[in-house]
Regions:
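Long, low-complexity, charged/polar intrinsically disordered regions in eukaryotic proteins
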Residues: 1-46, 50
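Long, charge-rich, low-complexity intrinsically disordered regions
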Residues: 16-19, 38, 65, 76, ...
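Charge-enriched amphipathic alpha-helical scaffolds
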Residues: 44-47, 81-94
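Short amphipathic alpha-helical elements of helix-turn-helix/winged-helix folds
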Residues: 47-55, 66
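Short acidic, hydrophobic short linear motifs in intrinsically disordered regions
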Residues: 57-80
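Residue-level detection of the helix-turn-helix DNA-binding "recognition helix"
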Residues: 68, 94, 121, 125
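A short, conserved structural fragment
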Residues: 94-107
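Short, amphipathic alpha-helical interaction segments positioned at domain boundaries
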Residues: 108, 114-142
């Protein structure tokens, strides 16, 4: 997704550092190994920001379910859902709150702040304009 990759690049330049433990952790009980990309933390933060934009207000628990996966027994049996790591999602949300892109709604979860909404809308418009340059038929969507 262009939006997530561009947003991840922007978040790298802003003050949202990856925790020191992010190099060693798996993303959940369903994962066999830690992520291979070194910038996975910023990509996950960008992805969380996008999910809050579409699904907010949303809780950490709901995001754990969305990012989780089915774990299959190696030899037999059905898939069983395993939630993603809550610490990763929680720390990413705290970083996004610090930047002012996300705010808490009591007993409901988190939503995008006005600043976060403007950031995503601006980036989406830039991406659409780039796509229109490549494919002029897309002009009907602007």
């Amino acid at each position: 997704n262009d939006l997530i990759s561009k947003l991840a690049e922007v978040l790298k330049t802003e003050d949202i550092p990856a925790p020191s433990w992010s190099l060693f952790v798996k993303t959940g009980a369903h994962a066999d190994k830690p992520p291979q990309k070194s910038d996975w933390w910023h990509t996950r933060c960008a992805s969380i920001l996008r999910k809050i934009y579409f699904h907010g207000p949303i809780s950490v628990n709901e995001l754990r379910t969305m990012y989780g996966d089915g774990k299959r027994n190696m030899y037999y049996g059905a898939r069983h859902h395993k939630d993603a790591s809550g610490a990763i999602i929680r720390n990413a949300m705290h970083g996004l709150e610090k930047l002012g892109y996300v705010e808490k709604v009591e007993k409901k979860g988190r939503v995008l702040s006005r600043q976060g909404m403007q950031k995503l809308d601006k980036m989406s418009t830039e991406i659409l304009n780039e796509m229109i340059q490549k494919t002029p038929k897309l002009k009907i969507y602007s």
